[in-house]
Amino acid sequence: MHTHFLSRRETLAGLAAVAIATAPPARATTPSPAATLLDSLAWRLLAFDPGEATRLGLDIGAHAALRGRLEDRSPAGIEARRRFLSDALVELARVPRDGLDPAMLTSLAVTESAFRTASEGMALPYGVATIGSWRNTPYAVIQNVGAWLDVPQLLDGDQPVKNAADAEAYCARLSAMAVQLDGETARIAAARRQGLVPPAFLLDKTIKGMTDSVI
């Protein structure tokens, strides 16, 4: 039996490049509160973005259920993610720093900075604010952002289909895409009520991309 902890330096994510480190029980040491917290935050964040868990190969074992889920792109889903960040920042502020090595201190600082920046972005009543990713945009859906692009890429490029359980997970995600589109539509409508509409040239690119993806 192995003890699994997410790589501390890679916890920043989206925690976009998170990885699992394993150590034999004979050499296992009790992780510091900081390491335990970063590991917990990484898994909680991956629960908000199950597709990332699949891309990283982490939707296995106790986390296998993530393989059949998609992130919540509705206004309620965005608010839940914002609350997670707010709570996480409190937890990060409380974790003891005394005696930590420079690598761990750096991991905490980078994670805290990324979470704070994302939290500030999510406080805005429109757009997409990511955690540790470049895909920030004032629009809920645009030519390079949205379920219309992300779900097909996930299912075609990263979703394993090796057995019946995998096939069921694939179908579950395919069905859940409709819910994602509804959530994004609600955010687009809310942004429009605020007068936030993409310029025509971006709409043209987005519509062309959507059209090409279904032809």
Regions found by a protein language model. Name each.
Residues 1-2, 95:
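Short, flexible active-site loop motifs that bind/organize anionic cofactors or intermediates
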Residues 2-4, 10-28:
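N-terminal export signals
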Residues 27-215:
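N-terminal maturation segment of proteins
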